[in-house]
Amino acid sequence: MNNTDIKLVSVIIPVYNEEASLPVLLSRVTAACELLPQDYEVILIDDGSHDGSTEIISEAAANSDSKLVGVLLNRNYGQHAAIMAGFETAKGDLVITLDADLQNPPEEIPRLVEAAMQGYDVVGTVRRNRQDSWFRKTASRLINKSMQKATGVHMSDYGCMLRAYRRHIIDAMLCCQERSTFIPILANSFARRTIELEVGHAERAHGESKYGLMHLINLMYDLVTCMTTTPLRLLSIVGSLVAGLGFTFSILLVLMRLVMGADWAADGVFTLFAILFTFVGVQLLGMGLLGEYIGRMYTDVRARPRYFIHQIVRTATPSQQETEQ
């Protein structure tokens, strides 16, 4: 492959309350993209920010010599929905996603482009020497291992959004109409050739992570329920095992009553309650999983848009400027 296969590179950055990081982010992303032999555009998706992020994005995108495009959503839809809005706007032959918190260095962008030019459909990344808390790293490891088992898609770092996708992968993802999706797994399901590169990782310089405990739990549910029906099959297996154990315990309790007498049965009340609570807990867990799937089906059936673009801000073309005059 040569440079003519990738004529335009689109860099998509979802932004949510990143006012403090944006000036440095724009400077570093622009500097990295200027090193590319291809032309480029940088698309900033404002995901319903409440600070000054919207104004910074609009002002930067309106500059006459800017290659920035500002996509302003009417409210917060979440990281992956915002990225899908960027995919819809992007015109590039290669599309790169990047978080706005600067934990993944924009200087890695040329490496991703170079890897894509070698014929890879998706270029993933793995964070080297992660600068996150012990809790975040432990949760990520558990999620990565669980997702590899559940989806069958082997990726080393599901949480790193610094990735590159060829145009046909973007078009395939845009054809998918489900409301909840996880972009890295979805992209890999369409890719023929993939590769993962190790990239640097820095501490968050400004603000707090948007992924708290509840957000990580919601992400786990999103990952599992939007990409695989494995939990439903596991639920059937667990239900069968629990039913078998319950039947075995019932026989055992009857035998113990016959052998040990009624006094022993009275002493076993707490054991019975413990067993009962265990079975009820498994049932409630199963009902919760079924509820997740049914809720997602209901959301998909309503067929509401994933997002609503309030405004797109970009530099006016000469023809547009003449029309305005």
Curated annotation (Swiss-Prot):
Entry EC number(s): 2.4.2.53
PANTHER family associated with the record: UNDECAPRENYL-PHOSPHATE 4-DEOXY-4-FORMAMIDO-L-ARABINOSE TRANSFERASE (PTHR48090:SF3), UNDECAPRENYL-PHOSPHATE 4-DEOXY-4-FORMAMIDO-L-ARABINOSE TRANSFERASE-RELATED (PTHR48090)
Signal peptide: none
GO annotation terms (biological process): 4-amino-4-deoxy-alpha-L-arabinopyranosyl undecaprenyl phosphate biosynthetic process; lipid A biosynthetic process; lipopolysaccharide biosynthetic process; response to antibiotic
Record's function text: Catalyzes the transfer of 4-deoxy-4-formamido-L-arabinose from UDP to undecaprenyl phosphate. The modified arabinose is attached to lipid A and is required for resistance to polymyxin and cationic antimicrobial peptides.
Top class in the EC scheme: transferase
InterPro entries: ArnC_tfrase, Glyco_trans_2-like, Glycosyltransferase_2, Nucleotide-diphossugar_trans
Keywords: Antibiotic resistance, Cell inner membrane, Cell membrane, Glycosyltransferase, Lipid A biosynthesis, Lipid biosynthesis, Lipid metabolism, Lipopolysaccharide biosynthesis, Membrane, Transferase, Transmembrane, Transmembrane helix
Any GO molecular function: phosphotransferase activity, for other substituted phosphate groups
Localization per record: Cell inner membrane
Topology in the lipid bilayer: Multi-pass membrane protein
Family designation: Belongs to the glycosyltransferase 2 family.
Membrane-spanning intervals of the chain: 234-254, 269-289
A Gene Ontology term for the protein's cellular component: plasma membrane
Protein name from the UniProt record: Undecaprenyl-phosphate 4-deoxy-4-formamido-L-arabinose transferase
Domain of life of the organism encoding this protein: Bacteria
Reactions mediated catalytically: UDP-4-deoxy-4-formamido-beta-L-arabinose + di-trans,octa-cis-undecaprenyl phosphate = 4-deoxy-4-formamido-alpha-L-arabinopyranosyl di-trans,octa-cis-undecaprenyl phosphate + UDP
Pathway info: Glycolipid biosynthesis; 4-amino-4-deoxy-alpha-L-arabinose undecaprenyl phosphate biosynthesis; 4-amino-4-deoxy-alpha-L-arabinose undecaprenyl phosphate from UDP-4-deoxy-4-formamido-beta-L-arabinose and undecaprenyl phosphate: step 1/2; Bacterial outer membrane biogenesis; lipopolysaccharide biosynthesis
Record-linked NCBIfam families: PRK10714.1 (NF007986)
Pfam families registered for this protein in UniProt: Glycos_transf_2 (PF00535)
